[in-house]
């Protein structure tokens, strides 16, 4: 991953984290970064992996969290601006430490130079009309609540809400962000994101949301974004239909303490 030191510190909420490290011959060979009960990051340099160093760090983190009254540890955490879980390649390590998976997600990317909306077989517009939301925010929040109540807090600015409507009724919706500052920015420069993509249950399975995301992806390309980033999804195969590809899979791990 290509990421600058300053961006790393910013994304990590550095000032609210606790840092653990392991040294050999006065050189750091492993470290972990923890915020409250969330292990934001744990790294062991390859030559030192498999020697119990990571296990010792986990033990130190458990004691630290327990001493502060926490009864569990989690990998990543959805509030993390870096990894929100344990990446799949490292999950076996966490299992050995007693972590249990309570879910999994994928993160996806599409290089926009390769994207061509007119080459896709889309059918949502057979029944839906697409455009930027220009109505009452309470109406969009009502539709969002039918999909995921926790998302309503993010729908606060109508200027970045894109919707599909059927006979004037909100059927699908998503948030649209350009020039995002995240862990992909240093590598890809201009990153855009469709987020909180959802379809009201009674309008599902009609291709409405798929065309909506495709249209938003085209918009991001028109705005000069280099890539479109899908953050935290459980429907990777659905996004693959319009060209997105998974580059990272993560497990949400939990370990009870005490």
Where are these regions (language model features)?
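Short amphipathic alpha-helix that is part of the acyltransferase structural core
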Residues: 1-23, 27-28, 105-107, 118-151
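A conserved beta-strand-loop-helix scaffold within acyl/acetyltransferase catalytic domains
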Residues: 7-19, 24, 29-42, 145-199
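A structural microfeature
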Residues: 29-30, 103-106, 171-172, 248
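A short, internal acetyl-CoA/4′-phosphopantetheine-binding micro-motif in the GNAT/acyltransferase core
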Residues: 39-50, 78-79, 196-204, 234
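Conserved acetyl-CoA-binding loop-helix of GNAT-fold acetyltransferases
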Residues: 50-65, 196-199, 205-218, 222, ...
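Acyl-donor-binding surface of acyltransferase catalytic domains
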Residues: 59-126, 253-255
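Short hairpin/turn module used for nucleic-acid contact or packing/dimerization
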Residues: 224-258
